[in-house]
Amino acid sequence: MAAAAGDVEAFLAACQASGDAAYGAAKAVLERLEAPATRAEARRLLGAVRRRFAAGGPAAGLECFRTFHFRIHDVVLDPHLQGFQQRKKLTMMEIPSIFIPEDWSFTFYEGLNRHPDSIFRDKTVAELGCGNGWISIALAEKWCPSKVYGLDINPRPIKIAWINLYLNALDDDGLPIYDAEGKTLLDRVEFYESDLLSYCRDNKIELDRIVGCIPQILNPNPEAMSKIVTENSSEEFLYSLSNYCALQGFVEDQFGLGLIARAVEEGISVIKPSGLMVFNMGGRPGQGVCERLFLRRGFRINKLWQTKIMQAADTDISALVEIEKNSRHRFEFFMDLVGDQPVCARTAWAYMKSGGRISHALSVYSCQLRQPNQVKKIFEFLKDGFHEVSSSLDLSFDDDSVADEKIPFLAYLASFLQENKSNPCEPPAGCLNFRNLVAGFMKSYHHIPLTPDNVVVFPSRAVAIENALRLFSPGLAIVDEHLTRHLPKQWLTSLAIEESNHAKDTVTVIEAPRQSDLLIELIRKLKPQVVVTGMAQFEAITSAAFVNLLSVTKDVGSRLLLDISEHLELSSLPSSNGVLKYLAGKTLPSHAAILCGLVKNQVYSDLEVAFAISEDPTVYKALSQTIELLEGHTSVISQHYYGCLFHELLAFQIGDRHPQQEREPAEVISKEMIGFSSSAMSTLEGAEFFVPGSMESGVIHMDLDRSFLPVPSAVNASIFESFVRQNITDSETDVRSSIQQLVKDSYGFSAGGASEIIYGNTCLALFNKLVLCCMQEQGTLLFPLGTNGHYVNAAKFVNATTLTIPTKADSGFKIEPSALADTLEKVSQPWVYISGPTINPTGFLYSDDDIAELLSVCATYGARVVIDTSSSGLEFQATGCSQWNLERCLSNVKSSKPSFSVVLLGELSFELTTAGLDFGFLIMSDSSLVDTFYSFPSLSRPHSTLKYTFRKLLGLKNQKDQHFSDLILEQKETLKNRADQLIKMLESCGWDAVGCHGGISMLAKPTAYIGKSLKVDGFEGKLDSHNMREALLRSTGLCISSSGWTGVPDYCRFSFALESGDFDRAMECIARFRELVLGGGAKVNGSN
């Protein structure tokens, strides 16, 4: 039944008034189409309107557009289509206020057409910027997807799209048109108003395919744009603007690609792992920029189709000319459609001004995520408050093996930073998870049943070798010639076997060839106490060479440390390894340990972690304690990186699928082996070490020199950015000038061009090298009473000569000039250690006058002064304590003794609130001391990613960034509140707290507990300040440092920079301990 002529005239009359009126009339028709009762009648009306103008051809359609503000016409889909299984054209309504199909959308559809038919069949598809819906409808018509969601931010096109859907889903009589599966277009297509993919996100719709022909609009303000480019051109544009990730976000926006970039990132969150995205890309920015938009976000791309279209004559491209003027980047235009050589924007602009016509490429790209689940995690992290980092993101890789390694790590790092608001407490022997993964890898791939306790983690192979030699301090050691490069020069030049005068505990190292028969001959002749060696490649294939080494070292009484770094493959198909074959069948003898330095990764050739394997509990415990004393710990980030590699090799395996074969027990070593050095032994027996918590009940650590406060988002952003960036320049990892400014602003210390600035993974590692320098000069190290116990024990471990400067509780355990002078009178070659401005562990402060007086006394006696600022930067009660000006202090000091010099030791983690992420530095100006320091070359140094991170954070601090300054103030306020609460709790529970003005710890005397008896599980005896640590730990799970650690009789140390929940539990433990020992109750105050 045809529509009445009156209905057609009434509809046209309603449309004639204006565009808004035409839209209103169309909406009224849509309402009738949506109602089943009036649907057929409304469809017949539209059919009649179309026929009214169809006879007049295109001219009549244009006349309808001008007169009635709409038109209904046919869009030809495929004139070459054979047969009748699909339509060759669609009928579409258009109104002036929406995007009308033109070259862009037709080119896009042609690109979609290049896909095989199966690519969309039965899939869930979203079209972004659907306009009047013709592509969504055409896609549904041709490929029979399960559902197509046509999305557009403009509500008017959505209404017209629904009309077009009814136009094509029903015939002219208003009857449904069914496809081969018995469905109509109404079953397959829906249209919604949506800002890009917000509709799908809000409704939790997962998509198989995302397609989009999104407008690209050039920046309308070339002056502002050129200013931005000019400011950034100092970054050298890193080969070209299109290849520099840090500026890429700007480029994408200015070229009109910003909307596509956002669509791609939104698409990552809703597309299925096997999903596909297809986008139109105008080629004006150049193919490099267009393709990098996808590549740097982790996509593999395929250019489906490319053609040229004319540049609209009314488009102003002067903005592009301005960018070219201020950069080396060149845009791509063509002269007319037939030109095949690209011309730049400036040439194109001049040609257009002279009446010429220019064109540009238009391409259709299909893109699919590589490692989609991991890339999704990365973008989920960036979306959670780290959007600024996305401009630095670069997931483009020429080598798939690099991508396979780096993308999973970035996903892991994103999850770790997202889940851990503060860095977790990890043992110094290595992160428990990492040691579990190493043990798991050895068990799964090499059938060696190790436990995490058998694995001790070191910053590097060189550090592991030196620390092991210091633990045993052998008179003679034979070391593989390939492994001596980082050993102290003194070890390589002394010759103890001549029995000449040599210092006690001096190690003599003899270089040895790696070939086993020659090495064995040396061992038999020289009878060393320790042998450190690797293995030649041809000898590592079988176990024979290893068995011979074990035998000869056992016979002569040598300890063996065997390096297998070159032979351990992190692969799912590792090659044969004779040492690991041996360990699969036999327990490692007690006199032998295995060493492996991990440097074989695809991404960072200089990122190293090492681990040692021992099955002797005495040895692996001592190695763990040695790393705690001499290094502090190994970089957590480095362990995460290699841990991720191990995890990838283990994640797909079914655990314990094969029963573990019985191993032969290790041979009993009848010959006496060298034990630990006397200084190491006495230190290990008396020092306090990390107490690991059990799985059932975690230990609350108030005994550690680190903060567990929440890590600010700015820190996490900088960490993540350091890994997502590629092509980082040397200048971006150079922290020298930033540290110079920091020490100038904070301490008035001038570190000019003559000063040497040395970086270390930890401040403790740098300090220990200074101790060795002191020993080399035959000096005496002077510690004030009430010094960080780790530092004192580290010096004792290496048998340094030390002396204590007396201090008093009523002066906050600060060094008094008279006491310092009296102590210096007694020694020659003095080295004075001063912790300040904040004293660790007491939390009191040295003023500028205080340090000036101390330096004056040191200068009089020609002492070397080590000023340790590592606990400073978080002073929360500095009223009346003037800021340091070391430059002025030193200029006022007159010393006739050339030995006087000042060394500044620092740690950035407190200054920059990077709890758990350490970066030590050392500033020296005495050239002879610098030379001595460099004679101990095994220092573990921060990786370039850490240097990039800390340079960014130092920039925020030095430039007094308001947000970053507020974060530091917030942490200071938190620490002040914690200190106040802790003092109140301690004093209410029978302790005499000394109080503090800065830092993260304070001292307190257990006055009410001394002499009291306590009997709990694992502890029985009378309490004193030495056993208070064990008593508290056994009875409550709270771990503090005893007076043995502080060095101050009767005073224990409490660290209070804990995670808020742990701090609350610590307060409860202190109260509970009082009840256990003294009886009665104590009020527990909550924490802020």
Curated annotation (Swiss-Prot):
The keyword Transferase applies. One of its GO terms (molecular function) is pyridoxal phosphate binding. Gene3D superfamilies: Aspartate Aminotransferase, domain 1, Type I PLP-dependent aspartate aminotransferase-like (Major domain), Vaccinia Virus protein VP39. Expressed in the shoot, scutellum, and aleurone cells but not in the root or endosperm. Its EC number is 2.1.1.12. GO terms for cellular component: cytoplasm. It is found in: Cytoplasm. CDD domains: AdoMet_MTases. The keyword Mitochondrion does not apply. Pfam families: Aminotran_1_2 (PF00155). InterPro entries: Aminotransferase_I/II_large, Met_S-MeTrfase, PyrdxlP-dep_Trfase, PyrdxlP-dep_Trfase_major, PyrdxlP-dep_Trfase_small, SAM-dependent_MTases_sf. It catalyses: L-methionine + S-adenosyl-L-methionine = S-methyl-L-methionine + S-adenosyl-L-homocysteine. One of its GO terms (biological process) is biosynthetic process. Keywords: Cytoplasm, Methyltransferase, S-adenosyl-L-methionine, Transferase. It is an enzyme of class 2 (transferase). PANTHER family: METHIONINE S-METHYLTRANSFERASE. Belongs to the class I-like SAM-binding methyltransferase superfamily. Homotetramer. Catalyzes the S-methylmethionine (SMM) biosynthesis from adenosyl-L-homocysteine (AdoMet) and methionine. SMM biosynthesis (by MMT1) and degradation (by HMT-1, HMT-2 and HMT-3) constitute the SMM cycle in plants, which is probably required to achieve short term control of AdoMet level. Also able to catalyze the selenium-methylmethionine (SeMM) from AdoMet and selenium-methionine (SeMet). May play a role in phoem sulfur transport; such function is however not essential. This is Methionine S-methyltransferase.
